[in-house]
Amino acid sequence: MAKLTKRMRVIRDKVDVTKQYDINEAVALLKELATAKFVESVDVAVNLGIDARKSDQNVRGATVLPHGTGRSVRVAVFTQGANAEAAKAAGAEFVGMEDLADQIKKGEMGFDVVIASPDAMRVVGQLGQLLGPRGLMPNPKVGTVTPNVAEAVNNAKAGQVRYRNDKNGIIHTTIGKVDFDSDKLKENLESLLVALKKAKPSQAKGVYIKKVSLSTTMGAGVSIDQSGLNAVAN
């Protein structure tokens, strides 16, 4: 059996895996256990009451967290004309059409989000094999294919998170950094849960939000008592 590291022993001793923690208690515990030499992200896993094998029960979308994610986001926009100027004014780092596609084909991908206006999809469509595996392919379901590229850039810069359930019906995303105030992390979490509730498939039956867990980049998961969250009502 592998020997536990000192960090793992501390986590094992501090975290009760059978307990559902009040959100404030959970955040305090995560902060205490976040001892990495960098500012760890606070990640959330939400178990949904869906059948992920059925396409009409899959959950996908995006929402802007009220306090952002604490990450600096670099944005590439495929568009032209007035939209190109609007995207630049909104703060996009990369704006173009075929010229931007050529950069990507050369392996130059210094961005975190790709946005496209509908007329640019003829160019973006050629990049599926490069952007798709990295989760960067623009999609109207998450607001990254839109005629209003400036708004999409603003959302990305403001702390928009995209979510999509995995094959087990679990949503994984981030809600901030461990150095955020507890209230900000709670409000970001509640904002995400509100968005997930709005995205509930009509075919999903029974309890929808089954379990909510928080963790830091290098830490263990802490199960959250949903009764302490304003956003949750199954």
From Swiss-Prot:
Membrane-spanning intervals of the chain: none
Q: Which UniProt keyword terms apply here?
A: Repressor, Ribonucleoprotein, Ribosomal protein, RNA-binding, rRNA-binding, Translation regulation, tRNA-binding
> What is its quaternary makeup?
Part of the 50S ribosomal subunit.
> Which Gene Ontology molecular-function terms are recorded?
rRNA binding; structural constituent of ribosome; tRNA binding
Name of the protein in question: Large ribosomal subunit protein uL1
Gene Ontology cellular-component terms listed:
cytosolic large ribosomal subunit
Q: What is the lineage of its organism?
A: Bacteria, Pseudomonadati, Pseudomonadota, Gammaproteobacteria, Enterobacterales
Q: Which organism is it from?
A: Pectobacterium atrosepticum (strain SCRI 1043 / ATCC BAA-672) (Erwinia carotovora subsp. atroseptica)
Taxonomically, the superkingdom here is: Bacteria
Task: List the Pfam families.
Answer: Ribosomal_L1
List S-S links within the chain.
Answer: none
Describe the task this protein carries out: Binds directly to 23S rRNA. The L1 stalk is quite mobile in the ribosome, and is involved in E site tRNA release. Protein L1 is also a translational repressor protein, it controls the translation of the L11 operon by binding to its mRNA.
Question: Which family, according to the similarity comment?
Answer: Belongs to the universal ribosomal protein uL1 family.
GO biological process terms, alphabetically, are: regulation of translation; translation
